[in-house]
Regions:
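Active-site glycine/GP-rich loop and adjacent strand/helix microenvironment
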Residues: 1-119
Length: 119
């Protein structure tokens, strides 16, 4: 195409829909000259925008005014404490037409409590 990073002029990219590795992130950032951020969503809930990375990139912020997240043991279905890896489960708080109650995502992750350095 003959375009350079300067020609494109992108500074930020938000990427979702599929998991990516840190090496993939680094390659995209280097090739396009931008800072890449992860955005998480589920089409069953609302698509992108369930959670997103901030500039600190210490994990994703969940939009807790719309979603109640839990982590469960996928075999026993017992709720796990913060910091332990398990299956992510969501309850929607603001969907009126088709609310989801403890929707199992099949995604493995953990929840962190506390304040992010971004504020």
């Amino acid at each position: 195409m003959g375009l350079t990073k300067k020609d494109i002029g992108l500074r930020i990219g938000a990427f979702g829909a599929e998991p990516w590795t840190e090496s993939m992130r680094k390659e995209i950032e280097e090739r396009l000259g931008l800072k890449g951020y992860n955005i998480y969503g589920l089409s069953e809930i609302m698509g992108p925008g369930v959670s997103y990375e901030c500039q600190e990139q210490h994990g994703s912020h969940i939009n807790e005014d719309h979603f109640y997240p839990e982590i469960i043991n996928p075999e026993t279905l017992e709720r796990l404490p913060n910091g332990e890896v398990g299956e992510l489960v969501f309850t929607t708080l603001t969907k009126e037409g088709m609310p989801l109650l403890r929707y199992r995502t099949k995604d493995l992750t953990s929840l962190m409590e506390g304040e992010c350095p971004c504020g």
